[in-house]
Amino acid sequence: MIKVIKLGGKEYQMKASAYTQFAYKNETGRSFLDDLSKLTELKDLGSDDITKSLKALEPVFNIILDMSYIMINEAVPNTFNNREDFYKSIDCIFDDDNMDSITEIISLALSPIYRGNI
């Protein structure tokens, strides 16, 4: 599935497929499904909860950015040469506009695995 998602004030074409979880593991060394389960817990928090628990969310930042990086490069190969270049291009991860984007990123990442409502 391919979708355009706004992150850090910029629109990116992102793609999720059966390959996404393998690309994620190869790039990060972490389990795609384990990290997705952490993000689905985040999705249920309201924006006030997130603001109050930013310190607790710190590990989640990398998961969101890493998943975005993988799906952007899957949609349009070589959009970024490496994760560091991608990280530098993002001005803000969490703001009122990005909360919907984060939900979209999670839903897109899950789409090759499960197409129901989350």
Predicted regions and their residues:
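Charged interaction scaffolds used for protein-protein
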Residues: M1-E11, S31-L54, N62, V76-I118
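Short capping micro-motif at the N-terminus of alpha-helices
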Residues: M14-A16
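Short, surface-exposed, low-complexity cationic segments
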Residues: A18-S37
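Short, amphipathic alpha-helical segments that act as regulatory/interfacial helices
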Residues: L65-N73
